[in-house]
């Protein structure tokens, strides 16, 4: 029970930790997106003054700038709350300034867990399995004890008694002794029905404990397989999101170049910037998802430390 509670605390703390890392990276992303929009806003303003862009183009960009500022504010507020939650879980004062080890990393270190696993590891480490195995053994012994209480019992007794004077001749002042040997047999004739009932009840309890153990093993096997599947799925999503981000960056680069050359409209640049923001955000989510699925797999195996 202590081991299971400790793993729950570790998992909650890890979740809060990576939530902070996610929001730190999304804050950087929101700041970069806002900077892009502000730069585009300045370029469009110059083009309006030169008569090669309309006020509608300028208004469209300013709306995006305002939206980006609001998004940045929301991310900052969420980051502050996430830091407070992490402090609370770690027993630190909520107002304490903390800097996490992975905050300044460009790419989060990933795939430290092998998705291949041995179910025997989970059976050995999961506390609920150990508890149910112990309960099964106890109920099996209870059957033996209950059966023994209602089986015939035989007792052999013997003693040797020495007296002076002798019990055979009271006038003889000598030590004389004799042996006493007896056999006692106890057969539960009147309570045999009660014994059968109690034995059957004990066997039923033992079978229930065995079924509970089997059910727990099956559920843990399902849980571990689901966690391993999610690890693999998260890895695939990360690969796809990385490719998508590369394409979005290339698209934004061509859109920005075309805009400066005057062959691409402002709306196309805004679309490219939005796609760039979405691709980066998806990659951050995919990286964090990989870390969290690794944690869930370790917990399902009982190896989370």
PLM regions: where:
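Small/polar (Gly/Ser/Thr/Ala-rich) solvent-exposed segments
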Residues: 1-4, 130, 140, 149-179, ...
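Periplasmic alpha-helical coiled-coil/stalk elements that build and connect Gram-negative outer-membrane
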Residues: 2, 8-121, 227-230, 234, ...
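Amphipathic alpha-helical coiled-coil segments
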Residues: 5-28, 46, 82, 131-146, ...
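Metallo-beta-lactamase
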Residues: 75, 127, 209, 286
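Residues on the lipid-exposed face of transmembrane beta-strands in outer-membrane beta-barrel proteins
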Residues: 86, 183-187, 286, 297
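Acidic, glycine-rich loop-and-beta core segments that form the ion-binding/anion-interacting portion
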Residues: 108-109, 114-155, 159
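Hydrophobic, lipid-facing positions within transmembrane beta-strands of outer-membrane proteins
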Residues: 118, 179-185
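Short cytosolic juxtamembrane segments of multi-pass membrane proteins
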Residues: 152, 299-305
């Amino acid at each position: 029970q202590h081991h299971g509670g400790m793993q729950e605390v570790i998992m909650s703390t890890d979740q809060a930790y990576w939530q902070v890392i996610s929001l730190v990276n999304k804050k950087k992303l929101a700041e970069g997106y806002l900077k892009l929009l502000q730069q585009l806003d300045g370029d469009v303003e110059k083009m309006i003054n030169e008569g090669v862009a309309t006020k509608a183009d300028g208004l469209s960009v300013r709306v995006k700038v305002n939206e980006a500022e609001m998004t940045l504010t929301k991310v900052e507020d969420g980051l502050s709350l996430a830091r407070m939650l992490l402090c609370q879980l770690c027993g630190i004062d909520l107002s304490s300034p903390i800097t996490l080890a992975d905050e300044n990393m460009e790419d989060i270190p990933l795939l430290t867990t092998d998705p291949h696993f041995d179910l025997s590891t989970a059976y050995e480490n999961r506390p609920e399995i150990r508890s149910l195995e112990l309960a099964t053994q106890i109920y099996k012994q209870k059957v033996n004890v209950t059966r023994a209480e209602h089986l015939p019992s035989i007792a052999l007794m013997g003693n040797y008694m020495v007296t002076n004077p002798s019990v055979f001749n009271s006038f003889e002042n000598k030590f004389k002794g004799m042996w006493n040997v007896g056999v006692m047999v106890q057969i539960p004739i009147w309570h045999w029905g009660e014994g059968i009932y109690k034995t059957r009840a004990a066997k039923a309890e033992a079978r229930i404990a065995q079924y509970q153990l089997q059910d727990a093993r099956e559920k843990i096997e399902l849980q571990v397989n689901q966690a391993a599947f999610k690890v693999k799925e998260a890895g695939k999503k990360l690969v796809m999101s990385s490719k998508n981000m590369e394409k979005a960056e290339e698209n934004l680069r061509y859109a920005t170049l075309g805009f400066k050359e005057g062959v691409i409209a402002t709306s196309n640049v805004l679309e490219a910037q939005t796609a760039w923001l979405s691709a980066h955000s998806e990659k951050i989510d995919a990286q964090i998802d990989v870390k969290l699925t690794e944690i869930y797999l370790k917990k399902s195996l009982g190896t989370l430390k």
